[in-house]
Curated annotation (Swiss-Prot):
Pathway: Amino-acid biosynthesis; L-arginine biosynthesis [regulation]. This is Arginine repressor. It is found in: Cytoplasm. Belongs to the ArgR family. GO terms for cellular component: cytoplasm. The gene is argR. Regulates arginine biosynthesis genes. Keywords: Amino-acid biosynthesis, Arginine biosynthesis, Cytoplasm, DNA-binding, Repressor, Transcription, Transcription regulation. It comes from Anaeromyxobacter dehalogenans (strain 2CP-1 / ATCC BAA-258).
């Protein structure tokens, strides 16, 4: 493993372990872990790791790109405001700026129930695959996103 690989591994560990909001915070944490890097190097490392800043209820923080069976959905829990379904689709409402990241994570997770997603700034349209009923899809998405599913249903009912 090269020194660059070790440094990137350290960056990934730091991002997973702590809420990091700026590159300056990340550089300081990296230095405490025994690694020296410039801001330009760190920026390239973040791009290579697929890291991005995601807005959440407590401000923007760095998160890693999708890695794992859930496409990174676990990291996005808490950013969903509601999930509603009608006879043909599911609508997910999110915190402002979060919809693209959540839609991408859903797409990367490739749940067989999902045909595709379309995201705006704070709203995602989810098309169910095949003959799957949107109510069942809403419940499955609520499970994946850590959102209560008791009220997920058709006819515009909301989960949260």
């Amino acid at each position: 493993m090269t020194s660059a690989d070790r440094r990137r591994d350290a960056v990934a560990r730091i991002i997973r372990a702590r809420r990091i909001g700026t590159q300056e915070e990340l550089l300081a944490a990296l230095e405490r872990a025994g690694f020296r890097a410039t801001q330009a190097t760190l920026s390239r490392d973040l791009a290579r790791l697929g890291a991005r800043r995601v807005s959440g209820p407590e401000g923007a923080v760095y998160e890693l790109g999708a890695d794992g069976a859930d496409g990174g959905l676990a990291a996005l829990r808490g950013l969903v405001s509601s999930i509603a379904a009608n006879a043909s689709m599911v609508v997910i409402r999110t915190h402002p700026g979060s919809a693209p990241a959540i839609a991408r994570a859903i797409d990367l997770a490739q749940p067989p129930e999902v045909l595709g997603t379309i995201a705006g700034d704070d709203t995602i349209f989810v098309a169910p695959a095949g003959e799957l009923r949107p109510r069942r899809l809403a419940a499955r998405l609520a499970e994946l996103l850590g959102t209560p599913s008791a009220l997920a249903g058709e006819g515009g009912e909301r989960t949260h």
